[in-house]
A protein has these predicted regions:
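Short hydrophobic beta-strand that contains or immediately precedes a catalytic carboxylate
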Residues: 57-61
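Phosphate-interacting basic helix/loop segments used at nucleotide- and nucleic-acid interfaces
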Residues: 40-50
Length: 166
């Protein structure tokens, strides 16, 4: 169970449940790529070690306002308002680097599932993703006693807006 403790009351003052056709809007037709073929899932420690390699391309799959308050060291942060924009920007920007080792990360791992499948569909050869996203990374790094490579705060979708990663 994952939880956050906030001492000033409830994080959400209103709960709205909506049924959507996709968990994350990507603007892509379901038939254009295979969501069962995703990048390799990396543990927090594997991701942590690989982010220190200058040959590795670390890409933030979150929106620009999320990466502005926090990101991993040396990460490329697309200037995208939406995931729909970010996924296309990454393919276009790095189209000539399809053989390079790519590490993707996002808040909880959902956007990276789609992004890694899309990159593999477009011919990228070595795509990995941080399993469980920044949230899982923060918990594992703290448990292992390692110094985090995440700079700033992790954007959260409640009134706190950001959560420190130690």
């Amino acid at each position: 169970i994952k939880y956050a403790i906030v001492d000033d009351g409830r994080s959400f003052y209103k709960l709205t449940i909506k049924v959507r056709p996709k968990i994350v809007s990507d603007g892509l037709d379901h038939g254009t790529y295979d969501l069962s073929k995703v990048g390799k899932h990396l543990s927090a420690i594997e991701f942590h070690e690989l982010t220190g390699n200058p040959e590795t391309l670390v890409i933030d799959m979150r929106n620009h306002y999320e990466s502005e308050i926090g990101r991993f060291e040396n990460a490329v942060c697309p200037d995208a308002d939406t995931f729909k924009d970010a996924i296309r920007m990454v393919v276009d920007e790095f189209n000539n680097q399809k053989d390079r080792k790519i590490l993707l990360y996002c808040t909880g791992g959902i956007r990276c599932e789609k992004a890694s499948a899309y990159l593999l569909h477009h011919g990228f050869k070595d795509v990995s993703q941080l399993y469980g996203g920044i949230i899982e990374y923060a918990q594992q790094i703290k448990h292992l006693g390692l110094t985090s490579r995440f700079i700033g705060k992790n954007f959260v979708f409640d009134e706190r807006l950001g959560e420190t990663i130690d």
